[in-house]
Amino acid sequence: MKKRIPTLLATMIATALYSQQGLAADLASQCMLGVPSYDRPLVQGDTNDLPVTINADHAKGDYPDDAVFTGSVDIMQGNSRLQADEVQLHQKEAPGQPEPVRTVDALGNVHYDDNQVILKGPKGWANLNTKDTNVWEGDYQMVGRQGRGKADLMKQRGENRYTILDNGSFTSCLPGSDTWSVVGSEIIHDREEQVAEIWNARFKVGPVPIFYSPYLQLPVGDKRRSGFLIPNAKYTTTNYFEFYLPYYWNIAPNMDATITPHYMHRRGNIMWENEFRYLSQAGAGLMELDYLPSDKVYEDEHPNDDSSRRWLFYWNHSGVMDQVWRFNVDYTKVSDPSYFNDFDNKYGSSTDGYATQKFSVGYAVQNFNATVSTKQFQVFSEQNTSSYSAEPQLDVNYYQNDVGPFDTRIYGQAVHFVNTRDDMPEATRVHLEPTINLPLSNNWGSINTEAKFLATHYQQTNLDWYNSRNTTKLDESVNRVMPQFKVDGKMVFERDMEMLAPGYTQTLEPRAQYLYVPYRDQSDIYNYDSSLLQSDYSGLFRDRTYGGLDRIASANQVTTGVTSRIYDDAAVERFNISVGQIYYFTESRTGDDNITWENDDKTGSLVWAGDTYWRISERWGLRGGIQYDTRLDNVATSNSSIEYRRDEDRLVQLNYHYASPEYIQATLPKYYSTAEQYKNGISQVGAVASRPIADRWSIVGAYYYDTNANKQADSMLGVQYSSCCYAIRVGYERKLNGWDNDKQHAVYDNAIGFNIELRGLSSNYGLGTQEMLRSNILPYQNTL
């Protein structure tokens, strides 16, 4: 299998590029061809007051009580129509009712239809006043949508809202196909609620019953309804056989939940996966609680742990109240560092190094905003679990623009850092940053002159253990004060490309920036939250080399760059390219000896960065970027991708990602950057392709190869068959799932998945390619 995936991908790429044959037809359109439509003029409003029209070969009656019609009888009122060989019409005066009760008995080849349903059988009855209708021993077919079946007795009730079946069946398969069906002693189809309720339900595949439930609900539309969703299963080398049976609970219009028992054979237990969504005045959010009571594999691998319970809690919330209050939560926590290696989860990955737990409350009015937050990290490393949390953090911004020709801003922050280890330094940091800008602009250019004053105070505690083991000592009280000055100028030139491409426009956008920040020795300040920022083209013009406030590098530098764009006659950007560099007049320093390049006195060093995008045609696109840093003496990072995308189901993408080991050491925490898997950096080439291979078959493949290790990094292959009443998806994935420090090699997981979806119950007729593309550990990202 591992050797065949690249070959299969190459075949898919070739057929996607050179096949000119379109899909035979849209699957939804094909399915609707087998569904009857209402072809008479639709009557709106109350039809009970409309006259009844009767056509027949023969008629006799006892006026006004009874009448008998025989021979091609056709009765119509509003949207309803009843046809039969013989019809008996009865009319009786009802006490207290202004209108007589009119009923119909129909015999022989009974056919009833309206704009909702068609009923056929040997015998029927109808109430012309209420539109209640009975048909015995017949079959039914929904109008304008999939859904049909048979029953001993079929009843229409509630102004055609309900179809009630006694000893009936239901399937969304088109006539001539009974691939699946549900039979029950009573079936009630509610068109308004878009649900079918079934008592003593037996689910059948063909003629074979495979599942029984005393009560079952099936959604027959796009409306939210409580009930079991379609189960699915897969096999992985991590957990062996896995089976999911999700239940959807429509709690209220503003909240719902999905409860999924997830059986894992190798773990010897059921994980309960509980997802809860809500919408309130304070915003919208999602919570997930997954719980595995015990895990026999974890017990064997971690015999010293007191508990083998495995769990995950995730909470995401975002909202605004009263237009001024803002509430945000981004919280993920798991029972142990191995959780995402052992279990697939959409809220985390085996490639993640940590989980974040952040709460924030903000207040914002014109010219002012303030946010109070707490932020913690759970590090997924058994070698180094040290991490800093901000408990709490206050951020304040005050803006006052148009103060004469100037714009002003004051930013302030106060934060207390706490470490998960008792022997690590902790600190309280207070920062104040007033800024004044002089913006000048016209229709072809702008220049912004900015001056800042950066004042930071640290009160550091718990320094004994660190100072006893390091030559550079930390001070308990540190004040750092520095000015910052920046001038940033941009121009935009534009020309028509009549000679080369009529209707197209090209721009040339040069940019130059001078930045000055004096040097301050920050070796007596511990690094609590700073890390090197990536220097892509836009990053060249940042005024900070590091994120956070603990490391503010000195700067005496000029950044220059140029961007060129090409727009078509519809003002759609077809091409852009950006190239820029930073020239350092003096070395950029912080005084931190742990930063490798600060040990070399390099003036005049350069950082180069370039980005490009080319929309070659409506179907072809190319993106790329590269950064070269003379301080690292190599290409720091680069990436490129080219994509052919005919539609969402037919695409091919080739991509390459690179990060040098020196760049990784400079940007990642030490306990990650020195890990064995990163010692040679990252160099991966990959391919992604998807394509319908027949009217109803689609295939998706992805393959990533590590050129440093000369081995596969990740691969995926998925195939889906889609019909009008069901879809079957089979997938295989081999993914990187961690690193074995004892054996010094990568750990892989092989997974085979199987999923069945009932079609015709909603408006989803997709070929499944996008779902399969997103399921990969390295999910597809659109280049166009």
UniProtKB/Swiss-Prot annotation:
Compartment annotation: Cell outer membrane
Modification note: Contains two intramolecular disulfide bonds.
Database matches in Pfam families: LptD, LptD_N
S-S bridge residues: C31-C724, C173-C725
Residues spanning the signal sequence: 1-24
Superkingdom classification of source: Bacteria
InterPro entries reported in the protein's UniProt record: LipoPS_assembly_LptD, LptD, LptD_C, OstA-like_N
HAMAP family attached to this UniProt entry: LPS_assembly_LptD
Subunit structure of this chain's protein: Component of the lipopolysaccharide transport and assembly complex. Interacts with LptE and LptA.
Family: Belongs to the LptD family.
Official protein name in the record: LPS-assembly protein LptD
Species, as recorded: Shigella flexneri
Gene: lptD
